[in-house]
């Protein structure tokens, strides 16, 4: 492997164990790719689509990754005119059944950290856009749009589409504080229709005399502690597993798609999730073929915090193994281990690295196997996590009580200036920070990093089995 993939300047090295970097792509040099999706054409070509909602541009980045050693950047695909829709971003997307579905937001990303009521009258899109990839995967064809009904809000965040007629959304909804679960029928993609929804009882503002809320308010810690859907609402059969921030894990029954019902709940606060972290309960991932759900508490990017500024202890943000053989009694059975610190790493651990105090360290996004996406790895004995500053971590979960980390990759720090950052204007350290990961059916792993491009890796050594 060429040295260029280990370093981006003197003293700016990456760290790797049981993995090999096949390639790196900066795309067009404009950073901002966040959630990624793969699509495999009938001819066997692999395309990577990345939602971008920060840096210098919004929309979707498109690359061909058929040859993992030579990815080809195709284009930056703009969904809406940024001059007409200056606050509209595309933080998330899903691809299945030849359709690309994009989350539209006017309050996600850095904007969610500050109050935005003065922007509420600006033209925006908040919902989902639907495109066809079948005709030309390099030029998505617009089919339709569905609006969530809450202007200048987060709109839609991380969601699930596994093919078929239903899209499962984490979504804003009028009269509800925070995002709820909404189900949209796209049988006619030109005219999407909502067919069902579910919410935590405390979210229904109109159910309380005199209660009001502001959908444009900043996502301060007090809001993050509340029960609201981060997503995705992860569907397996007639059950849905929901990471619901302060409320923890919800298990829902959607045998009747028009009337989701709560089956079980497991709360993880106050023991887990730190005061300054992101989504208190972020992801709920059911492992293929097993009665197990992997649940995460989101950490946070250290660059949001001035060095030495955090004085109070931060509770553990971690990855948890939950047994759901009885959906009414989801049970915590094991904790994932702390990420291995490389021997030559310049900091003693990931909690204090480069921050001079304990930061809200923790995991972020997981690889999400879905049976409607046959081009993805579907293993139920492996978990892949982009762990913010701890990089990509791969776990062997064949024994759910004895979880083993088997590989990692921490990229070099990005070379972008603070002004070029995905999240510009924040005072903290700009370490390498992995955001999302996806694994294809050939075993190639793709990760993207904050203020950087994407890496394609493959397992080696003990991880290659």
What are the language-model segments listed below?
Residues 1-465:
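Feature marking well-ordered beta-strand scaffolds used for ligand recognition
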């Amino acid at each position: 492997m060429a040295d260029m993939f280990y370093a981006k300047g003197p003293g700016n090295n990456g760290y790797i164990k049981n993995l090999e970097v096949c390639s790196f792509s900066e795309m067009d040099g404009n950073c901002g790719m966040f959630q990624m999706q793969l699509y495999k054409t009938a001819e066997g070509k692999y395309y990577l689509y990345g939602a971008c909602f920060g840096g210098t541009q919004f929309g979707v980045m498109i690359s061909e990754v058929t040859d993992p050693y030579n990815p080809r950047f195709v284009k930056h695909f703009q969904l809406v005119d940024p001059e007409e829709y200056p606050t509209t971003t595309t933080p998330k997307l899903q691809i299945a059944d030849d359709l690309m579905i994009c989350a539209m937001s006017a309050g996600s990303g850095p904007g969610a950290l500050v109050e935005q009521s003065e922007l509420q009258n600006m033209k925006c899109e908040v919902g989902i856009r639907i495109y066809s990839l079948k005709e030309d995967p390099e030029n998505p064809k617009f089919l339709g749009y569905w609006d969530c009904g809450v202007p200048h809000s987060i709109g839609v965040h991380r969601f699930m589409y596994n093919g078929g007629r239903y899209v499962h959304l984490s979504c804003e909804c009028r009269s509800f504080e925070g995002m709820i679960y909404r189900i949209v029928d796209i049988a006619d993609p030109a005219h999407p229709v909502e067919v069902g929804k579910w919410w935590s009882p405390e979210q229904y503002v109109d159910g309380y005399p005199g209660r009001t809320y502001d959908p444009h308010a900043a996502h301060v810690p007090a809001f993050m502690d509340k029960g609201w859907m981060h997503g995705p609402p992860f569907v397996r059969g007639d059950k849905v597993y929901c990471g619901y921030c302060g409320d923890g894990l919800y298990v829902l029954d959607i045998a009747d798609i028009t009337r989701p019902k709560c089956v079980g709940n497991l709360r993880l606060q106050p023991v887990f999730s730190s005061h300054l972290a992101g989504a208190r309960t972020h992801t709920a991932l059911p492992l293929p073929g097993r009665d197990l759900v992997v649940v995460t508490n989101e950490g946070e990017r250290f660059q949001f915090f001035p060095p030495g500024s955090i004085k109070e202890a931060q509770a553990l943000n971690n990855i948890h193994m939950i047994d759901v053989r009885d959906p009414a009694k989801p049970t915590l059975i094991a904790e994932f281990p702390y990420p291995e610190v490389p021997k030559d790493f310049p900091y003693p651990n990931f909690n204090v690295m480069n921050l001079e105090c304990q930061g809200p360290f923790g995991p972020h996004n997981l690889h999400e196997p879905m049976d409607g996406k046959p081009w993805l790895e579907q293993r139920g004995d492996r978990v892949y996590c982009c762990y913010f500053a701890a990089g990509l971590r791969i776990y062997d979960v064949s024994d759910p009580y004895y979880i083993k980390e088997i590989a990692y990759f921490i990229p070099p720090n990005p070379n972008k200036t603070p002004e070029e950052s995905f999240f510009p204007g924040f005072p903290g350290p700009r370490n390498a920070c992995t955001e999302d990961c996806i694994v294809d059916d050939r075993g190639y792993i793709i990760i993207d990093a904050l203020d950087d491009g994407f890496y394609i890796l493959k397992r080696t050594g003990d991880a290659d089995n």
